[in-house]
Amino acid sequence: FFYGCTNKSSYSNSDDAYINYATDMQLMYHIGGNAPMTKSDKGYYYIGEDGIVIFIDKETKKATPLCSKPNCTHDDPEACDAYLNLTQKPDTLVGAHDSAIQYNDGYLYALCGEYDKSYINYNTYLMRMKPDGNQRENLTGSFNFYAFEWFIHRGYFYCSTDSSVIRIPLDSPKSEPQILYKTDYY
């Protein structure tokens, strides 16, 4: 074998060679299937205790709840903007929540959920909001499946269900999911 040095300009460079944190899945922040932290151009966001979103400013390194209310004590989910109604995981103890958040193309995304008025049916959906925590919206409507693991990558929401891997385009989030893989054994 022969080894040598070369300058970087001689390498072939493709769009797929590097991760763009603004549009690609941020694999480096996934821990055991969850992604409790995500990077943006201004800093980092993470899911803290009880589903509260914390922003860490890149310049000042100051961590603050993502809440717009100046005198908020951040201890009441009904009153504090920093709380997310994160989806409950069906395969864990009651009350365990998905703790994933992802920054992608100028927005923050999280899986959220809520019971209907009868408290029988649990509705899960993909929530999108601006990086300042405002303009929250239910992007997909209620899923008719449970999303076990999920991420956003290059314009698509990908997730695994109990029997398949699907994707939904973010530019048409209420469209029928495209099945990428389906098992016959579940």
Task: Kindly give the residue locations of the regions a language model identified.
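Short glycine/acidic-enriched loop and turn motifs that connect beta-strands
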Residues: 50-52, 114-120, 164
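Short loop/turn segments that connect beta-strands within beta-propeller blades
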Residues: 57-61, 130-134, 169-174
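An edge-strand/N-cap motif at the start of beta-rich repeat modules
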Residues: 7-64
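A short loop-to-beta-strand structural motif that recurs across blades of beta-propeller domains
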Residues: 52-54, 65, 125-127, 164-166
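Beta-propeller fold detector
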Residues: 63-79, 137-143, 176-184
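Residue position within the beta-strands of beta-propeller blades
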Residues: 45-47, 109-112, 158-160
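Repeated scaffold domains used in trafficking and secretory/extracellular systems
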Residues: 27-40, 75-103, 143-154, 182-186
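C-terminal motif of bacterial Sec signal peptides marking the signal peptidase cleavage site
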Residues: 2-4
